């Protein structure tokens, strides 16, 4: 039952205007080319900024704001469009989100802690790209990973504001032999755009050719196998 609930909440919508930004490995993401905004807010970088660099190369009038309390950021000293804050963000209220923007979150297991609140602060976010970690035994300093119900509540909140258009398995979790979370791979990369109720349910499995690539170890497992079933169930309502 829990597995089916997660599948329903993580059912991508069909969207054909996707591109890959960043390397064809860890650190690259599949995003909507129509929801880039004029500002990218990146939470977590570990001084690996290929994603941010390519974002600026295709969106040259934009700016990038990076937060990371655990690393430096060489890109900020090379490009005046980039500002860096050497701090970790623990609440969305710490961010200035005052105009349409894109947000990228890779904070190694604290995403539930950050987003487990009212999401009104995200009303100006056109696109949200995030890596989620269901289990966090690798990062004991962070708050304990959330319960099943906490994740369900978060996905419901996100689905109320956004449409999920892409899902990718980060194979680092497979190699590290992390347990699945009620049937879901431990590390998932999710791409959301501003809510669009006209989008239909995706009927393809992921990965998608020429967009999805293994993160590090040559694995690219299939995901999204439940979409046809979800589409059928929705049509019967």
Residue ranges and their predicted role:
Residues 1-34, 39-41, 48, 54, ...:
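Rossmann-like AdoMet/SAM-dependent catalytic core
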Residues 34-36, 55-59, 79, 119-125:
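Short, conserved loop/helix-junction motifs that constitute active-site signature segments
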Residues 38, 62, 82, 125-126, ...:
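A structural micro-motif
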Residues 43, 67, 103-105, 130-132:
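Active-site flanking residues adjacent to catalytic metal/cofactor-binding acidic residues
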Residues 47-48, 66-75:
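Short, polar loop motifs at secondary-structure junctions
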Residues 72-110:
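S-adenosyl-L-methionine
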Residues 122-137:
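Conserved beta-strand signature within the Rossmann-like core of class I S-adenosyl-L-methionine
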